[in-house]
Curated annotation (Swiss-Prot):
Record carries keyword Transmembrane: yes
Subcellular location as annotated: Membrane
Entry keyword annotation includes Membrane: yes
A GO cellular component annotation in the UniProt record: membrane
Species this chain originates from: Human cytomegalovirus (strain AD169) (HHV-5)
Membrane topology: Multi-pass membrane protein
Primary localisation category: membrane
Name of the protein in question: Uncharacterized protein HVLF2
Keywords: Glycoprotein, Membrane, Transmembrane, Transmembrane helix
Family statement drawn from the similarity comment of this UniProt entry: Belongs to the cytomegalovirus US12 family.
Glycosylation-annotated residues: N178
């Protein structure tokens, strides 16, 4: 029995047997069908979330290159660049969401529906090459990290995540003949989720600032999601490369790069604004020595335009 959601006819047959015979076996069968239906719904949500996270991680892997192309001062002076729309980054993020849904229902769901009849991959060398190619995709992100002179913690967490994903990919490759296709998917997703939760726990339990936590969380999950997605796709060798979908994939990734870059830039602007507000609230020694007349004179002589961000 597969993980597909039972159709209306199948449910009627099961419940008809349940009411006709009244045996516990039929009751157990109906319970199993219901549980499998909920498992399938959960699987749909997980696959869509995985595709979305893969696109976001691929975008984060090349975010550093945008800071070399576009000057930071120009981007800060134009929050809605290049459309001059304030909410342009948030609106553009809806495109990857719709893209993930389209890719799932167009390509992933038919494969999942036929995985019980899918032939076992008999090209171990090609699987190994694809796994190594997915792992070598970390090198550009690692180079961007070094070029941007990120803190040592970011580089360390990224390298550790690379090592962990390499071990996970090797385990999946070794166990490909000892378990079924669904068991391999379960193994990959289980290891992926566990390592991701451990990574989040490490990041948010350290006494770091929020910008550093966001940076660590982004860069350290890039390799994990990249390797997880590639190790899933190598199980379906004929679905890894889709020439008819190259243009669509390139477009959605490019839009994701731009939107996430401006979102992170907006987070940085908010951090700068909060730091400026904290500096304004801190009492200085010179301000404590001023008299009330001096303070009123200074406030009246200061134009309001200088106080606006």
């Amino acid at each position: 029995m597969g993980l597909r959601f039972p159709t209306a006819t199948q449910r009627q047959i099961v419940f008809r047997r349940l009411f006709d015979s009244g045996n516990n076996d039929d009751y157990d069968e109906a319970a199993v069908v219901a549980v499998l239906g909920w498992v399938h719904r959960f699987e749909v949500v997980v696959r869509i979330a995985g595709l979305l996270l893969f696109q976001i991680s691929a975008a984060v892997a090349v975010l550093g290159s945008f800071s070399l192309v576009f000057p930071t001062a120009t981007l800060k002076s134009r929050p809605g660049f290049p459309c001059h729309v304030v909410w342009a980054p948030e609106v553009l993020l809806l495109v990857p969401v719709a893209s993930a849904l389209f890719v799932y229902f167009r390509y992933e769901r038919p494969v999942l529906a036929q995985r019980n009849r899918h032939p076992r991959c008999r090209r171990p060398f090609r699987q190994l090459v694809l796994l190594l190619a997915g792992l070598l995709a970390h090198i550009p992100a690692l180079g961007v990290t070094c070029a941007c002179q990120e803190p040592r913690e970011v580089l360390t967490s990224f390298v550790l995540t690379l090592v962990i994903t390499l071990l996970c990919a090797e385990v999946v490759f070794i166990c490909r003949d000892n378990c079924t296709l669904s068991d391999q998917f379960t193994l990959i997703n289980g290891v992926w989720v566990v390592v991701f939760l451990v990574n989040v726990l490490i990041v948010f339990t350290r006494p770091w600032t929020w910008p550093l936590r966001l940076l660590l969380g982004f860069y350290s999950t890039v390799g994990l999601i990249f390797a997880g997605h590639f190790s899933q796709q190598v199980l379906f060798v004929r679905h890894v490369l889709m020439p008819r979908d190259v243009a669509h994939t390139s477009l959605q990734l490019f839009i994701t790069f731009i939107s996430l870059f401006f979102l992170i830039l907006r987070i940085r602007n908010c951090q700068d604004l909060l730091s400026d507000l904290r500096l304004l609230e801190l009492p200085s020694s010179d301000a404590m020595t001023l008299t009330p007349n001096d303070l009123s004179h200074a406030s009246s002589s200061t134009p309001l335009s200088t106080l606006s961000p």
